[in-house]
UniProtKB/Swiss-Prot annotation:
CDD domains (UniProt xref): ATP-synt_Fo_c_ATPE
Gene name of the record: atpE
Major location category of this protein: membrane
The species this protein was found in: Thiobacillus denitrificans (strain ATCC 25259 / T1)
Protein name, entry field: ATP synthase subunit c
Membrane topology: Multi-pass membrane protein
One Gene Ontology cellular component: plasma membrane
Residues passing through the membrane, by range: 10-30, 52-72
Domain of life of the native organism: Bacteria
Subcellular location: Cell inner membrane
Keywords: ATP synthesis, Cell inner membrane, Cell membrane, CF(0), Hydrogen ion transport, Ion transport, Lipid-binding, Membrane, Transmembrane, Transmembrane helix, Transport
Site feature location: Reversibly protonated during proton transport: 60
Classification of source organism: Bacteria, Pseudomonadati, Pseudomonadota, Betaproteobacteria, Nitrosomonadales
Amino acid sequence: MEMTQAVLYIAGALMMGLGALGAAVGIGVLGGRFLEGAARQPELIPMLRTQFFIVMGLVDAVPMIAVGLAMYVLFAVAG
């Protein structure tokens, strides 16, 4: 039973850690592309900003789901 709980704790930690890492990389790339597009065509900044925030929310939603599942694994399944 102890080994099973340890594996579940490690799985939950990996889900949260890798989810945060993936979101950070994704938002960093997205922000870089936004700045690149804004520098090339400044007149499109309002449209680009709207699209940037929509896509940033979608990129950030997947890690939040992973964090929710990790909390479930840590507190409901392993606890």
